[in-house]
Amino acid sequence: MSVKIRLTRMGSKKKPFYRINVADSRAPRDGKFIETVGTYNPLVTEEQVTLKEERVLEWLSKGAQPSDTVRNLLSKAGVMKKFHESKLSK
């Protein structure tokens, strides 16, 4: 089972809001997921991202692959840097 960290679209027409979910790669975009680890709101002037950093780092260490967009969001939040530092310190 390949696990991905990806965005799930919520909100209404023309007003998207996304949840950052951990899901099986075979599940549909808005389908079954394992855990919600954050949210992303692209419509506010400053893109608003909230994350459960400990849970994201745990899933990354277990081998979960972030999607391209989620990888960019995690990089901006500094989570990917922490992950790489913890990986190198082992």
Swiss-Prot record:
Is Ribosomal protein one of the keywords UniProt gives this record? yes
Q: Which domain of life is it from?
A: Bacteria
Record's GO cellular component terms = cytoplasm; small ribosomal subunit
What are the protein's GO molecular function terms? Answer: structural constituent of ribosome
Task: Set out the biological process GO terms recorded for this chain's protein.
Answer: translation
Question: Which InterPro entries is this protein grouped with?
Answer: Ribosomal_bS16 (IPR000307), Ribosomal_bS16_dom_sf (IPR023803)
User: What UniProt keywords apply to this chain's record, in alphabetical order?
Assistant: Ribonucleoprotein, Ribosomal protein
Keyword set includes Transcription regulation: no
Signal peptide interval: none
Query: Which HAMAP family does the UniProt record give?
Result: Ribosomal_bS16 (MF_00385)
Which family is this protein grouped under?
Belongs to the bacterial ribosomal protein bS16 family.
Q: What is this protein called?
A: Small ribosomal subunit protein bS16
Q: What is the lineage of its organism?
A: Bacteria, Bacillati, Bacillota, Bacilli, Lactobacillales
